[in-house]
Structure formats: structure tokens, C-alpha cells
Curated annotation (Swiss-Prot):
<keyword id="KW-1003">Cell membrane</keyword>
<dbReference type="Pfam" id="PF03350">
    <property type="entry name" value="UPF0114"/>
</dbReference>
<feature type="transmembrane region" description="Helical">
    <location>
        <begin position="136"/>
        <end position="156"/>
    </location>
</feature>
<protein>
    <recommendedName>
        <fullName>UPF0114 protein PA4574</fullName>
    </recommendedName>
</protein>
<dbReference type="GO" id="GO:0005886">
    <property type="term" value="C:plasma membrane"/>
</dbReference>
<keyword id="KW-0472">Membrane</keyword>
<keyword id="KW-0812">Transmembrane</keyword>
<dbReference type="InterPro" id="IPR005134">
    <property type="entry name" value="UPF0114"/>
</dbReference>
<feature type="transmembrane region" description="Helical">
    <location>
        <begin position="10"/>
        <end position="32"/>
    </location>
</feature>
<comment type="similarity">
    <text>Belongs to the UPF0114 family.</text>
</comment>
<feature type="transmembrane region" description="Helical">
    <location>
        <begin position="53"/>
        <end position="75"/>
    </location>
</feature>
<keyword id="KW-1133">Transmembrane helix</keyword>
<dbReference type="InterPro" id="IPR020761">
    <property type="entry name" value="UPF0114_bac"/>
</dbReference>
């Protein structure tokens, strides 16, 4: 009976596979939105103010960071919790493939969240004159919470590895 439960629990990890596949659909949706934004900007590029163009570029950078985060979570999550990826020898292989454990994945996700939060904060500061001071304060507090959390997770991970 114990053996049955252990095998069933171990096999249940495959329930994560469709979730990771769903993340690839989310990446497709993000890609569509990315190009929608580019196609929206191109006809208006000469009429746009520099600040507006910078805001659009920050939005595109933000989408690229989120896309990278999705790929990282998708691939390393699959490798850590479901099954190892079997990539043919002749094909290009990501340098971190097979090397990222759940601790380093957490740190990379935290660093990505800080980067994404930084982009959002920069976009808000570009329009700071239209944002109430108390809202700006909360945006900075939330961003600093992300930064401190990322540092704390990295520090704790380093302490537990030694």
C-alpha cells in the first residue's frame, strides 16, 4: 500500500507538465502583444514625443523581461519537478540548462521581478508630475520590498549552501 502511494505521488509530478505547456501559450500571447505594440508605434513614430517613445520602449523591455522570466520558469521548473529535457547533441543548448536547482531558480525569479519592478518604477517616474506623492511613495516602498526580498533570498540561499 505504501509503495502504491509513493509511486502515485511520484507520478503526479506529470500534472505539472500541462501547466508548463500553458506557460508557453502565455509566452505566445505576450509575443503577440509585443508585436501589436510595435505595429501600433511604427506609423506614429515621427509624431511621438521623445518621452512617449521612451515609455513605449520601456514597455517593450518590460515584456521582454517577462518573456525571459516565463522561459526560465517553464524550462527549469519542468526540469526540476517533472523530467529532464533531452536535447539533441547537435542542437543549441541554453548554458543554464540542467544546472538550475529550485534555489537558484528562486533567486533568478526574484532578480527578474526586481528588474521588472524597476522598469515599472521608471515608467511611473517619467510621468511623476501626474502621480500623487503618496502613490509614488508606495511604488518605491513596494519596489524596495522586492529588492530587499531578493537580497534576503540570495543571502539565505548562500548561507544554506555553505
Amino acid at each position: 500500500m505504501e509503495r502504491f502511494f509513493e509511486n502515485a505521488m511520484y507520478a503526479s509530478r506529470w500534472l505539472l507538465a500541462p501547466i508548463y505547456m500553458g506557460l508557453s501559450l502565455a509566452l505566445l500571447a505576450l509575443t503577440i502583444k509585443f508585436f501589436q505594440e510595435i505595429f501600433h508605434v511604427i506609423p506614429n513614430i515621427f509624431a511621438m514625443a521623445e518621452a512617449d517613445l521612451i515609455l513605449v520602449l520601456l514597455s517593450l523591455i518590460d515584456m521582454a523581461l517577462v518573456g525571459g522570466l516565463l522561459v526560465m520558469v517553464m524550462i527549469s521548473g519542468y526540469e526540476n519537478f517533472v523530467s529532464q529535457l533531452d536535447i539533441d547533441e547537435g542542437k543549441e543548448k541554453l548554458s543554464w540548462l540542467g544546472k538550475m536547482d529550485s534555489g537558484s531558480l528562486k533567486n533568478k525569479v526574484a532578480a527578474s521581478i526586481v528588474a521588472i519592478s524597476s522598469i515599472h518604477l521608471l515608467r511611473i517616474f517619467m510621468d511623476a508630475k501626474n502621480v500623487p506623492d503618496n502613490k509614488l511613495m508606495w511604488y518605491v516602498i513596494i519596489h524596495m520590498t522586492f529588492v530587499l526580498s531578493a537580497f534576503a533570498m540570495g543571502y539565505l540561499d548562500k548561507q544554506t549552501r555553505h
